[in-house]
Amino acid sequence: MRRARSIASLCGLLGIGCSEPDSSSKAPIAAESEMLNPSDPATSCAEDSGVIMATPERYARYREWGFNRYAEVVAPNGKPIRIFVQEGVTDHQAHRARNVLRFFLSDFAGSPYGADKSAVANAMADNQAALMLPAGAHEEGNEPPFDAQPLYAAEMTVEGGPWYQNNNWEHRDATFEEIFHLVHDAGIGTHMPGALPDFQIALRAEAEAAIGDGRWGIPVDSGVTDWIEELRREDSLAQEYIASVIDSYYGYWGAFDDAPGGMWGIYIAKNRAEIASLDPAGLALLEAFLPSMVNYEARLDKRFTGTFSLAFDPSEPYTHKSQYLINATLTGSNAANLTGNAFDNRLRGNTSDNTIDGGQGTDTVIYCHPAADYTITTVEDWTTVTGPDGTDRLFDIERIWFHDGEVVLTQ
């Protein structure tokens, strides 16, 4: 497995971790949980608990290093893709990391390489792929000594949290980048046997082409050229190039105004429109594997108050990212609201009173108790739902999902 390495001047800037290989046994590993269908509304309720668990005793070395919690994504072959969570990383961060991993492994119908990702997920599990979430920030030479892709707490945001909402560049969200590195290395296949060798060949060739014509590897820093050569020596150009495209495609550099482009200016395109015009080849490769919208459930930080929007609003820079979300859930007990976008959203409130506006599309609000526990009243152009979760006002919502059935609204 490729351990990401970089020159000192860029290691922290790019969020690339460096670690020693783990000497643990490569014996077959059993899953600790069952595989749930993320497209089923019931999964939202089922995953309120049980996703993050105590680290199993068989991972004694991880436990010794403070990785006291564990999660996993179960591949179709029944084997786990493991996630180890160190003390100091929140459950919210770990849950989001798991959701992002599952999103990358979700089938994308009609795409050349992503229509059936079961072989990619199975390869990851067979390769005993692991994601580790250490506390704090990366420090060169102090990485936990495990054969696992690192993603540090200081580079993980959660929707609704202050780092996400304020686009805090001191805590630039590297979640998509680092988790896709794991999918790329252990699933698509680079230094380990993978499921999509032709895709990897195309990605590697395009990375070299992008360097050659100035789309990627732009020398905004004196160390970039050395970093690119280091990546070339370790055969990691493809991984870093497509990760840059992914970050800009899903809005993670849309609010960055310190330099043109994305990834601190190393990549030519800042947002999806710029990718289409400045790097159409990169766009084609990304869309050969990943969908245009992010379909994982965004579970908002429990501290969030106000209205979280899935619709782009130039006055709210965080919506460069949230505009590509489809499903969002409020957590905790603070008064907060949700606004959907033009897609078919699945939205869920918390234990407070919430206003949920679905916007365009066919939108569903999720409640985790039986329908008999709620009172539904339609008044003018909204619907009021009162029950164990408080009293919610619903606008432009077409369906309400309950634990025991669904109600179709007519407004």
Where do the language-model regions lie?
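Bacterial N-terminal signal peptides
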Residues: 8-15
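Bacterial Sec-dependent N-terminal signal peptides
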Residues: 15-39
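Bacterial N-terminal signal peptides that target proteins for export
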Residues: 1-8
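Post-HExxH zinc-binding segment in Zn-dependent metallohydrolases
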Residues: 187-258, 263
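Pan-zinc metallopeptidase signature
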Residues: 245-323, 348, 366-367
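N-terminal mature-domain "stem" immediately C-terminal to a signal peptide or N-terminal signal-anchor/transmembrane
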Residues: 35-91, 95-96
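Acidic/His-rich structured neighborhood in mature extracellular/periplasmic domains
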Residues: 78-215
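Glycine- and aspartate-rich repeat motifs characteristic of hemolysin/RTX-like Ca2+-binding segments
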Residues: 313-366, 371-375, 381-386, 400, ...
